[in-house]
């Protein structure tokens, strides 16, 4: 575990030193890289979050916006973390981040609404994200424990327990049918303490997550794969 942490932090340091992934170019008119504009998802939306895996648990993450003239602009870049076991999620608990193009279908957090264009839920002590695979227990959905007092808490996430990670969150609509066992609680969220990986989520620094929350729109697509498979380069 110690060796994995050291390797992960080393990879993150390298990403931070790279010109394309170091300082976020928030608010500046920086053209999006050609490989981003060539992604199939770019033809389906006017806003993208791109997660390009670099190494097993680190990623180059960027946000892009198409203007009224059809020109793509890169509005945010940052290094970040993906699942402890890398990419290619297939089941609950495999510690992998999903591969593909997905929408964000829910915005929430421990902090108050930062002005998100998606409906935002400020969570309290009653809120869990269900990992309960039994019928009727709202697998892979936000639930109020008062309505589901028999929820399997051990396999669900009590949102407020993740004080740093879940200040701001966007749910990645990976398991669209809420199929039990396929995977749950796959979010884009803030960095947590110490660990250079996630359980399958996408993690970025808190200030970058706040930027995403303030700029994301309902039609945004998040594209996740290795940087190589995306045709990208740093």
Predicted segments with their positions:
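Bacterial N-terminal signal peptides
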Residues: 10-18
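Sec-dependent signal peptide cleavage junction
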Residues: 20-26
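Cell wall/extracellular polymer interaction/catalysis modules
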Residues: 26-198, 207-234
């Amino acid at each position: 575990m110690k060796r994995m942490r050291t390797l992960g932090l080393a990879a993150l340091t390298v990403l931070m030193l790279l010109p394309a992934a170091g300082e976020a170019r928030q608010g500046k008119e920086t053209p999006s890289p050609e490989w981003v504009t060539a992604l199939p998802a770019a033809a389906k939306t006017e806003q993208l979050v791109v997660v390009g895996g670099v190494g097993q648990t680190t990623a180059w993450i960027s946000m892009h916006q198409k203007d009224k003239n059809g020109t793509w602009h890169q509005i945010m870049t940052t290094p970040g973390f993906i699942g402890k076991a890398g990419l290619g999620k297939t089941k609950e608990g495999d510690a992998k981040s999903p591969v593909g193009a997905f929408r964000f279908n829910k915005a929430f957090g421990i902090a108050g609404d930062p002005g998100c264009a998606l409906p935002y839920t400020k969570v309290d002590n009653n809120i869990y994200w269900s990992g309960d695979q039994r019928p009727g227990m709202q697998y892979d959905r936000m639930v109020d424990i008062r309505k589901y007092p028999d929820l399997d808490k051990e396999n669900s996430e009590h949102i407020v327990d993740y004080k740093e990670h879940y200040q701001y969150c966007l749910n990645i609509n990976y398991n669209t049918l809420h199929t039990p066992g396929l995977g749950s609680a796959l979010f884009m969220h803030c960095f947590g303490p110490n660990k250079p990986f996630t359980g399958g989520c996408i993690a970025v620094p808190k200030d970058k997550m706040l930027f995403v929350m303030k700029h994301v729109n309902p039609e945004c697509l998040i594209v996740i794969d290795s940087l190589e498979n995306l045709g990208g380069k740093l």
